[in-house]
């Protein structure tokens, strides 16, 4: 059964401006350690925009957004062997998911030159 749905779209140019202004402080705020290992220089802003939109979409599916103790670094977007995105939760995000009985988080991510979008469906396995 669907417990929550979230979506988010991010302008890659806005992320580039944040990178220019804040540099590593911005990446440290948004990314988990595992995600930072996947950083690449040539498409850094696009990668960050995808991660940012995915994390926002997950937080919306949890019904909190980025508040109530849920932070960007509580949501990790990794990849399965197949290349499909995989969501890992820690801290308050994990607690909120457990409170809602969420067992699976399905995520779809896409991007074009100027925009990144993510769509999330959180289910309880029923």
Q: Where are the model-predicted features located?
A:
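Core catalytic alpha/beta fold that binds nucleotide/phospho-ligands
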Residues: 1-126
């Amino acid at each position: 059964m669907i417990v929550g749905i979230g979506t988010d779209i991010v302008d890659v140019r806005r992320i580039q401006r944040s990178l220019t202004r804040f540099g590593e402080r911005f990446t440290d705020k948004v990314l988990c350690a595992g995600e930072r290992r996947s950083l690449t220089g040539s498409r850094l802003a696009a990668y960050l925009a995808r991660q940012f939109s995915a994390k926002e979409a997950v937080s919306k599916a949890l019904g909190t957004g980025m508040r109530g103790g849920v932070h960007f670094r509580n949501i990790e977007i990794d990849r399965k062997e197949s290349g499909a995105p995989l969501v890992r939760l820690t801290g308050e995000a994990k607690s909120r998911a457990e409170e809602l009985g969420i067992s699976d988080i399905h995520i779809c991510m896409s991007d074009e030159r100027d925009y990144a979008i993510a769509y999330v469906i959180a289910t309880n396995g029923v």
